[in-house]
């Protein structure tokens, strides 16, 4: 069993560092709940192995879905749900006890029958799977992702109680709350995925291939993270407001070249020299505390946002505008400074939406 567990930890860790940490913490929480319930040592081992393999099917999910930093679309969610059946197909012929396989097969089922893939309910769901569902969900609640904040320990415990009889077995929840109340959050597990592989993989999804800026998917989550950090920073928005006219006159290829030139100009005037792939790694790991460089996001067809942990001198921003005028395009920009001109995420979001609306854009 130990060899099997170690194999799956390494396999998952190489595919997605977050999933590895999620699995290790989930297994730890499941053990605590199982012991509180009075499971035998053999049952605990079966539960642990089931936890180690429960998400192995995610290695077959495309990066564009698995690593997405925002809520999945209904279509993407349907693909993500396949990880259960894919995982079972991957391991069903290995020497893994059926009780552990049941954890894999049924960990997404809900007590009220609204889960997947089979829609089982109540005690139709095997005991070990009912236990692991609670541990798995609790881990997700208390772990921060780029697109959501982590719930506090007490908030998560309260949610377990609120979902008793709906998502979770109401007879197990009191034991889970008692067991989990005695501890606090665990650190992320060690990431065995080589850094260069992570850079390539995440950059493939989050790096805009035309301009070299970070894709807009990461903009709002990063903005929220900077606000939550609580330290001063500056937000600058650049808009090429005559790009459509420019493209009609000079062609789309020339328009793409101009977009790239804008990012180059922003980098020269407003940003320190940094590998954007390193920046993406920091953003994905929520490691903004050590982020000392500006980050350029392409948030629309011709709009770019720059989040900087310092205020770029006004003349530097104006130099960007003048540089782009030499290339035949017109630039508008505005700056906001936290916590001087805004203090809340909703405030800056409203300003951004109004700006986009004013300029005839679709908005963010």
Curated annotation (Swiss-Prot):
SUPFAM superfamilies: HD-domain/PDEase-like, Nucleotide cyclase. Transmembrane segments: none annotated. It comes from the Bacteria. Residues 1-192 form the HD-GYP domain. Gene3D superfamilies: 3.30.70.270, Hypothetical protein af1432 (1.10.3210.10). InterPro entries: Cyclic_di-GMP/3'3'-cGAMP_PDE, GGDEF_dom, HD/PDEase_dom, HD_GYP_dom, Nucleotide_cyclase, Rev_trsase/Diguanyl_cyclase. PANTHER family: CYCLIC DI-GMP PHOSPHODIESTERASE TM_0186-RELATED, LIPOPROTEIN. This is Uncharacterized protein aq_2027. It comes from Aquifex aeolicus (strain VF5). The lineage of its organism: Bacteria, Pseudomonadati, Aquificota, Aquificia, Aquificales.
């Amino acid at each position: 069993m130990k060899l099997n567990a170690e194999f799956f930890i390494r396999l998952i860790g190489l595919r997605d560092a977050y999933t590895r940490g999620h699995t290790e913490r989930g297994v730890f929480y499941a053990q605590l709940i199982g012991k509180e319930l009075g499971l035998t040592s053999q049952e605990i081992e079966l539960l642990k192995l089931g936890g180690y393999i429960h998400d192995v099917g995610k290695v077959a999910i495309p990066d564009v879905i698995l690593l997405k930093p925002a809520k999945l679309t209904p279509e993407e969610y349907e693909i993500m749900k396949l990880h259960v059946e894919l995982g079972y197909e991957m391991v069903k012929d290995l020497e893994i006890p059926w009780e552990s396989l049941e954890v894999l097969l049924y960990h997404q089922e809900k007590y009220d029958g609204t889960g997947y893939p089979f829609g089982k309910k109540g005690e139709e769901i095997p005991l070990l799977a009912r236990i692991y569902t609670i541990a798995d969900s609790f881990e997700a609640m208390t772990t921060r992702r780029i697109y959501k904040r982590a719930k506090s320990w007490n908030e998560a415990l309260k949610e377990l109680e609120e979902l008793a009889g709906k998502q979770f077995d109401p007879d197990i929840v009191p034991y889970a709350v008692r067991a989990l109340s005695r501890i606090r959050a665990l650190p992320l597990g060690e990431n065995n995925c080589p850094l260069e592989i992570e850079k390539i993989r995440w950059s493939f999804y989050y790096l805009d291939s035309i301009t070299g800026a970070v894709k807009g998917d990461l903009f709002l989550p990063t903005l929220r993270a900077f606000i939550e950090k609580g330290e001063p920073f500056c937000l600058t928005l650049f808009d090429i407001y005559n790009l459509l006219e420019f493209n009609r006159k000079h062609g789309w290829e020339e328009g793409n070249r101009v977009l790239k030139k804008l990012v180059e100009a922003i980098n020269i005037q407003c940003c320190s020299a940094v590998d954007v792939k390193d920046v993406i790694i920091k953003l994905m790991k929520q490691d903004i505390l050590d982020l000392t460089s500006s980050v350029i996001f392409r948030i629309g067809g011709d709009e770019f946002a720059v989040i900087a942990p310092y205020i770029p001198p006004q003349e530097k921003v104006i130099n960007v505008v003048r540089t782009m005028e030499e290339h035949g395009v017109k630039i508008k920009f505005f700056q906001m400074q936290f916590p001087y001109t805004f203090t809340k995420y909703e405030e800056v979001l409203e300003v951004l939406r109004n700006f986009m609306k004013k300029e005839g854009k679709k908005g963010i």
